[in-house]
Amino acid sequence: PTYTPELCDAMAELAAGADILTPNLTEAAIILGEPIGDDWCGTDISDAEAARMIDALVAKGAKHVVLKGIQREGESVIRNFVGGVDCDMFEAANEYLPYMLHGTGDLYCSCLMAAVMAGRSLHDAVVFAGDFTHDAMIVSAKQPDFKNRGVSFEPLLGKVAELLG
């Protein structure tokens, strides 16, 4: 199995020292030792629940948390909530696209860190990462057999280079 209790404990230890922790809801639940599986609430959580999870992750030692992938029933956006030490919680949302692609979480985190390292604020970095990932998913959907190929971001790399300009 991929997720062993030992791996989950090690993830929680690493998370405690994070400057910017970027879990999806499943990862956040695992780090917090909260139920997943049949008892898990899924991705349709309230603002208050997002704030509770962020506060709990900060209490474990993360400086900032970007809680990714909140998708509420009947809405056409996907939300990411951000909060942390000396950072009031805020939300950044993008259009929800009705398909999943491998690598979007890694791409999002890479873009977030690129923007932070280029001197952007956490707010601007979160917006950049969400927009870049969204746009890469649209580019990917134009390719044959795209759902089996993973996210194609290469045509958009100029946007990352522009962070330095």
What positions do the PLM features span?
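Conserved phosphate/ATP/ADP-binding segment of small-molecule kinases
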Residues: 2-89
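Short pre-catalytic strand/loop immediately N-terminal to key active-site residues, enriched for Gly-Thr
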Residues: 89-103
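Short, small-residue alpha-helix embedded
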Residues: 99-122
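Hydrophobic residues in alpha-helical segments
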Residues: 32, 116-117, 137
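Charged C-terminal helix
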Residues: 123-165
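Glycine-rich beta-alpha junction loops
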Residues: 27, 69-73, 95-98, 130-134
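Phosphate-handling active-site elements
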Residues: 88-90, 115-129
